[in-house]
Amino acid sequence: MTMTSSTKLVRLNKLLAERGIASRRGADKMIEEGMVVVNGKKVYELGIKVNPNVDKISVDGKTIKGKSENIYIMFNKPKNVNTSMNDPLGRVTVADFMGEIPVRVFPIGRLDWDSEGLLILTNDGEYAQKVMHPKKEVTKTYHVKLEGQPQLYQIKKLLSGVAIPGGKVKAKHVEKLKGV
């Protein structure tokens, strides 16, 4: 909320995401709920811009610190582990495997409960956005074990697109691996 000619203002929700407090949407919710204080005043307005070098910002009574180093964790998610960092049903999550990490990290993308494989966790919101945003067209490769052989119509359906929660996905390429 302070402006100087040499300092770049940033949206408050973006700053909170960069500092590992919450995702941008999560930060918006915190702002709407009055959990964020800038220079001693509760902020409810979404889209507000702040000067990270000057403004005093706290969330839920805790002052946020300067930008921490970005962390990137490659995790081989086992089956029957929830990709989220917490689970209201009390199931095992990837957070249970993280131990003591000095900053909040989050998974980039997700793997289903009964899936296993590489999952990247980070506190770098910009990197996560680059990897996951459809406009960036980052290719992801999945190896899938099936019972039996897929029918031609099923492969065509994968190539033309399949509706899943959150949108439609389609394979660019489908092939049977030799020796599998």
PLM region spans:
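Basic, flexible Lys/Arg- and Gly-enriched helix-loop patches that mediate nucleic-acid binding at interfaces
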Residues: T2-V180
